[in-house]
Amino acid sequence: EQAKKLQNLRLDPSEAIDRITRAGLEVMGGFIVGFDSDGPEIFALQRAFLERQPVPLAMVGMLTALPGTALWRRLEAEGRLRQHSNGDQFSRPNFKPMMDERALLRGYAELMEWIYSPKAYYSRCEAHLHRAGLISETRSSTLGEVGALLRTIWHVGVLSPRRRLFWRLMVKAMLRGRNRMRQAVTHAVQGEHLIKYTREHVVPRMERALEEIHAGIEHDPRQFQPDGGKPPSGKPPARLRLSSGVER
């Protein structure tokens, strides 16, 4: 309701996702956290919802106030807009949130880390494979697709530490037909990228944002070195490090 997307309230989200998936289509989920009505429990609610859904690709973003929007004007009137923002989704928001900012950043980072943990990601891929409606096969695989499959088998099925999850998905996909096999391979490749990107880029950037708060620095990216280094106060205490406990 706060986003004025009332069309999303006409049907239960889980029912809508199930209908679309059983029709043979794939749902890609987009979620936003950081609304004024959101409390720290929002992250557990988002996780509980996604655990029940056949949605491999899910992106959660923190609310951002865009110039010229009703949200921007309201926050400006309330004196909550920040003067400096680099537009980085994986940093501090460009306004002062109602939720404790540490709780917002930590909860967001841990939710993203869980979404793209290997076990959770492949579990959603298998859920989609199980529920997806069958699509008639109308063409044979091209040489390019065969080559892509062989490269995927080598990089994900042999070299990757996630190879067991990959082969489990592949075996289940083989039983569902050629088109499902294509889709499973695509999911595996996408997952390999997203799992690494979340671990190597998203989480470290969120940790730096938490360090910024600990250092008592008002949000201004110009106060940081271009190499993405630490705030001037030095290394933060260990309690600021994220520890969601998910399998990486």
Feature locations, PLM:
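Terminal low-complexity segments of carbohydrate-biosynthetic enzymes
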Residues: 124, 136-248
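A structural motif corresponding to the C-terminal lobe/cap of the Radical SAM core domain
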Residues: 1-149, 156-157, 232-247
